[in-house]
């Protein structure tokens, strides 16, 4: 259950340490930021920003990669219900190819913060790169296993992206997007070799660019970024 007194408080309390440090420094509305989809060969990079009520514990919330799909889906709903604000930003395949994956990730993170229904006073960011915004912030290596806010953002980003890839699987059959979500699985690489890249493949990525025709005839139309506020 959620609340201030979980059955096993050690892990959730540890995950509030970074938020507690920011609160003691006088910052409020602390947003955790994380992304999903930096490594895949296809599809967008998705970032999420989550502001939780101070002191809220969410037992079970951890790095999304350590959770089952069923658990992520369950916690996705819990986070939306308990959070003060949730924002999502999307950098599509075309943006990734145009400005590189790091810059597309930072752009998606910035969009996620802008999509929040309230302005955060402090950002806790998974990774080592600051977001180009005039908001006090701190980067945290492996932050999705150290901060409840970042872990919550990790789950929102992962579930959002996975759902998008399931939709792409129906739109572009034969690649198996619903199963591997665009990552470089052997079955995915084999499909690219057989079918060639489809419109959502990242054409600057190894594993894809080797199979491009000399004059690509792929439609990269569509918005490069997206803002979604919950």
Curated annotation (Swiss-Prot):
Its cofactor is Mn(2+); Mg(2+). It is found in: Cytoplasm. GO terms for molecular function: manganese ion binding; RNA binding; RNA-DNA hybrid ribonuclease activity. It catalyses: Endonucleolytic cleavage to 5'-phosphomonoester. Residues 211-230 are annotated as: Disordered. PANTHER family: RIBONUCLEASE H2 SUBUNIT A, RIBONUCLEASE HII. This is Ribonuclease HII. The lineage of its organism: Bacteria, Pseudomonadati, Thermodesulfobacteriota, Desulfuromonadia, Geobacterales.
């Amino acid at each position: 259950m959620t609340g201030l007194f979980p059955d096993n408080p050690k892990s959730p309390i540890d995950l509030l340490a970074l938020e507690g440090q920011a609160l003691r420094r006088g910052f409020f509305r602390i947003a955790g930021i994380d992304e999903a989809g930096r490594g895949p060969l296809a599809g967008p990079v998705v970032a999420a920003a989550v502001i939780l009520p101070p002191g809220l514990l969410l037992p079970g919330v951890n790095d999304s990669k350590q959770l089952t799909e069923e658990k992520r889906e369950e916690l996705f709903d819990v986070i939306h219900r308990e959070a003060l604000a949730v924002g999502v930003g999307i950098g599509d395949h075309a943006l990734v190819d145009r400005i590189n994956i790091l810059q597309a990730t930072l752009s998606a993170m910035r969009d996620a913060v802008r999509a929040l229904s309230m302005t955060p006073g402090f950002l806790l960011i998974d990774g080592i790169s600051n977001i180009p915004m005039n908001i006090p912030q701190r980067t945290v290596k492996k932050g999705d296993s150290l901060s409840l806010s970042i872990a919550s953002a990790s789950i929102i980003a992962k579930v959002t992206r996975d759902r998008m890839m399931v939709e792409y699987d129906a739109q572009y059959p034969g690649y198996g997007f619903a199963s591997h979500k665009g990552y470089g699985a052997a079955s995915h690489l084999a499909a690219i070799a057989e079918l060639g890249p489809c419109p959502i493949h990242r054409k600057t990525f190894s594993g894809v660019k080797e199979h491009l025709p000399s004059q690509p005839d792929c439609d990269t139309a569509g918005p490069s970024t997206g803002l979604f506020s919950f």
